[in-house]
Curated annotation (Swiss-Prot):
Keywords: 4Fe-4S, Cytoplasm, Iron, Iron-sulfur, Metal-binding, S-adenosyl-L-methionine, Transferase. The gene is lipA. GO terms for cellular component: cytoplasm. This is Lipoyl synthase. SUPFAM superfamilies: Radical SAM enzymes.
Amino acid sequence: MATNEEHLRKPEWLKIKLNTNENYTGLKKLMRENRLHTVCEEAKCPNIHECWAVRRTATFMILGNVCTRACRFCAVKTGLPTELDWQEPERVAESVRLMNLKHVVVTAVARDDLKDGGAAVFAETVRAIRRKNPFTTIEVLPSDMGGVYENLKTLMDARPDILNHNIETVRRLTPRVRARATYERSLEFLRRAKELQPDIPTKSSIMVGLGETKEEIIEAMDDLRANHVDILTIGQYLQPTKKHLKVVKYYHPDEFRELKEIALSKGFTHCEAGPLVRSSYHADEQVNAASAARQMKA
């Protein structure tokens, strides 16, 4: 596999089939009418057409669409965020109802400008969804909220069905990939989430193709399992713009299959691994797998 940064060409298995049927256009219209953001759009997710047009799922992004951090892999805008919108939780909940979602993922930009990192709005969004959609399972994907224990507790007290927090890359590359976060703080965040609510599954994600080694990926798996993480997703890093980090390597689908086998052998209850896998990819299937694993342990 060629790894020359300047001459890497996107392989055939990363070619995406675009689908803009009425599900896609209807979902986009619903988001605009309710003044809502999705990470699908803001982060230029390659699966947006499959999720919106075929699966009719979306990942809501709350707390605005401007992030206080400038991670070098991420396409979300960076700058000074807008004021908090306390009506946003109700609008998200109503959109979930209109979409008739069985599983919903809620993520957010990092809000280092807020003392609680946005935890109060995040928690209220979970509660609002629960009130209007009592049978919908809820997955939350927050930033590290500054590593403040009280902020995490506020969110976990709202009782989401899955707590997802991404380490994004291996230990060695973290300072280069996401300079305003730390590898250890993310692991601590995941460990404390499990300590606060032991029955709530935790989840994390790793991007590959940034220059990591196979041994470093396996080390990251071990670190996640040591901190009681249940679910893992592994996907190919794709450069959003020329200003972002370049792709060092495109992994072959066979390599992803091998990584999945290794992850499952480490004790993860579920692992999604593939070129186009993202943190929220087939999230509805992951919550079902986590539920089945809990029942087996009971």
